[in-house]
A protein has these predicted regions:
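Alpha-helical, coiled-coil/dimerization segments enriched in small aliphatic residues
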Residues: 262-296
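Second-shell loop/turn segments in exported
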Residues: 85, 161-164, 194-199, 211-220, ...
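Extracytoplasmic ligand-binding site segments that recognize negatively charged/polar headgroups
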Residues: 114-120, 162-170, 185-209, 244-274
């Protein structure tokens, strides 16, 4: 981490708030006083490389003052807000996309901006986001100073992610930022394979989405998306063939545009696999001795992949490329490689982009529909794009 700046002693706008004890029994009061205002590995870290709408939801309890409210989410617990946050920082594109769905301004920062794939919005008229001022939290390390500079009203990040995934952070660093800047409120919902996830309480995409909607007091948008999602799943069901008719699929993170090494993924829980679970994907790696990358941090080579020989390759790490560019670079390399060209998926032109690690309610709709076409030759629309734009805009 960088050295502490001399400006650390200067008052932030939260110093003007009445905390009523600041931090009591793990509960943080989040004040919002201001009225203005493809890497080498899947995860590049130093260790592993509107208007608020009042609600009466049972999960949201009114405490502290007449206008304050509390929202509870594991592992952080209960967090009290005296008003809806106006600015925020998100861990990843899952949360950023949820914010988009709620009609929020984009987060000031995400872990890596190049992993928030806004290209998915291009096919939905009326839905777009300006990320020109968004910054990456990870910049050859994660500096506490950056959290002070960003000065968000809430950090939608599981603090355990910072402590366990980046060597430079301790619990005391998290406590400092929570007390002096803003609370943490988040869950590592995108994957469920980390060794530090023993006894971890996971949330589904829509459970996490509901919690975020409660934080920002925009539950009507959440409910509208939930209805849209139910309709989407009902349309998707007849698209998915019977188990015996589904091709075997291997999900891998390819290293570079000429991949001879791959990081394997077992299709499991987490938002990063929701589209594949909903499509009932038959996982070619699940029955092998190949371990999931999240737990092993190990790669496999083309020879090992050829032994498995899946019918379809779904490759991660290429979402910044359009389909044509992906095919002209990565797929073309595999077609002309001595070993890769023998893969059934390569021979049959069944090599596709797998979708990003981080999915929210909008991006999940887009990626699931795309994968339905890739895997099951579906040609059509599974969700109402105009309705998505209406919900984002607050038109119910």
């Amino acid at each position: 981490m960088g050295q502490e700046s001399s400006g650390r002693d200067a008052l932030t706008r939260r110093d003007y708030l009445t905390y009523g004890g600041a931090v009591v029994a793990g509960e943080f009061l989040a004040g919002c006083a201001s009225q203005a205002e493809s890497g080498a590995t899947p995860e590049s870290t130093a260790t592993d490389t509107a208007t608020a709408t009042a609600t009466t939801e049972s999960a949201t309890s009114r405490t502290a003052t007449a206008d304050s409210y509390s929202v509870t989410m594991a592992p952080v617990g209960e967090v009290t807000f005296d008003s809806p946050p106006e600015t925020w920082v998100a861990n990843n594109g899952s949360w950023a996309d949820m914010g988009m769905a709620l009609g929020l301004e984009p987060p000031k920062a995400v872990w890596l901006t190049n992993r928030y794939h806004t290209r998915y919005y291009d096919g939905i008229d009326g839905v777009s986001v300006d990320t020109s001022e968004m910054v990456s939290l990870y910049q050859d390390g994660v500096s506490r100073e950056l959290f002070y500079e960003l000065d968000g009203d809430v950090h939608v990040i599981d603090p355990n992610f910072l402590v366990n995934r980046f060597q430079g952070w301790e619990r005391s660093d998290v406590d400092e930022i929570a007390e002096n800047v803003a609370p943490f409120f988040g869950n590592c919902i995108y994957a469920q394979h980390y060794p530090w996830h023993d006894d971890y309480r996971y949330y589904t995409l829509y459970e996490g989405f509901e919690k975020l909607a409660q934080v920002f007091q925009r539950t009507e948008r959440y409910e509208a998306f939930e209805d849209l999602h139910d309709e989407f799943l009902s349309k998707l069901a007849p698209v998915v063939p019977g188990q015996g008719e589904r091709p075997s699929v291997a999900v891998l993170w390819g290293v570079g545009d000429t991949p001879e090494k791959f990081y394997p993924y077992i299709v499991g829980g987490g938002t990063g696999f929701k589209h594949l679970r909903d499509l009932g994907v038959r996982d070619a790696l699940a029955a092998t001795e190949i371990e999931d990358f999240h737990g092993s941090r190990a790669a496999i080579d083309l020879e090992t992949l050829l032994e498995v020989d899946p019918e379809v390759l779904m490759l991660r790490g290429y979402e910044s490329k359009a389909r044509e560019e992906f095919e002209d670079t990565v797929v073309d390399f595999l077609r002309n490689h001595g070993t890769a060209s023998a893969l059934t998926a390569v021979e049959n032109d069944d090599v596709y982009r797998a979708g990003g690690l981080y999915q929210g309610p909008i991006t999940n709709l887009v990626l699931t529909e795309r994968a339905a076409g890739q895997l099951y030759d579906f040609d059509g629309e599974l969700f109402d794009r105009e309705r998505v734009a209406e919900i984002v805009d607050g038109a119910f």
